[in-house]
Amino acid sequence: MSYKKKRCLKSSIICKNKKAYYNYFIEEVFQSGLVLMGWEVKSIRLGQVNIIESYINNDNLNEMYLYNSIVQPLHTSSNYVSCDSSRKRKLLLHKNEIQYLCNKKNKIGSTLVALSLFWEKSWCKLNFGLAKGKTKIDKRASEKQNEWKKEKLKILKKVKFQN
């Protein structure tokens, strides 16, 4: 009798969009699947993907797409398949989720931004957020808060070592 090995069920992050957290206030975070071609999955497994400038928009009322995400084509991919590295990719969402996102996105200053791409079991998933843009003043304030958090951690470490 043969026993199957249990695969690791942890989700592993492929890439993160750190600029999104710097340029936007993230209000809500959502998760969806992606419709990918075979060569795209192979490239993503190798980590040849970039979602820094990517955003989400709806062409029809029933479908949402990921734009400006770049998946580098493999040099070993076949010749009869056209490899468009920056094509729009369909998101797998329920109809009520799409309607909810469209209503939220129609507010002034709101947009949907890709945050991270990760594996969940054997499926490639996308985390994206409903975001509002930051001004220069907001960016400076968030930098000051981050620096203060780092300073607090340093002080706490010093206090713990002294006791």
Curated annotation (Swiss-Prot):
Enumerate the Pfam families for this protein.
SmpB
Does this UniProt record's set of keywords contain Cytoplasm? Answer: yes
UniProt KW keywords? Cytoplasm, RNA-binding
Give the InterPro entries listed for this entry. SmpB, SsrA-bd_prot, SsrA-bd_prot_CS
This entry carries the following GO cellular component terms, namely:
cytosol
Per UniProt, subcellular location reads as: Cytoplasm
Which cysteines does the record link by disulfide bonds? none
Query: Principal place where this protein is found?
Result: cytoplasm
In its keyword annotation, does this UniProt entry include Lyase? no
One example of a Gene Ontology biological process annotation? trans-translation
Q: Which GO terms describe its molecular function?
A: RNA binding
Give the protein's function: Required for rescue of stalled ribosomes mediated by trans-translation. Binds to transfer-messenger RNA (tmRNA), required for stable association of tmRNA with ribosomes. tmRNA and SmpB together mimic tRNA shape, replacing the anticodon stem-loop with SmpB. tmRNA is encoded by the ssrA gene; the 2 termini fold to resemble tRNA(Ala) and it encodes a 'tag peptide', a short internal open reading frame. During trans-translation Ala-aminoacylated tmRNA acts like a tRNA, entering the A-site of stalled ribosomes, displacing the stalled mRNA.
Regarding protein family, the annotation reads: Belongs to the SmpB family.
Q: What is this protein called?
A: SsrA-binding protein
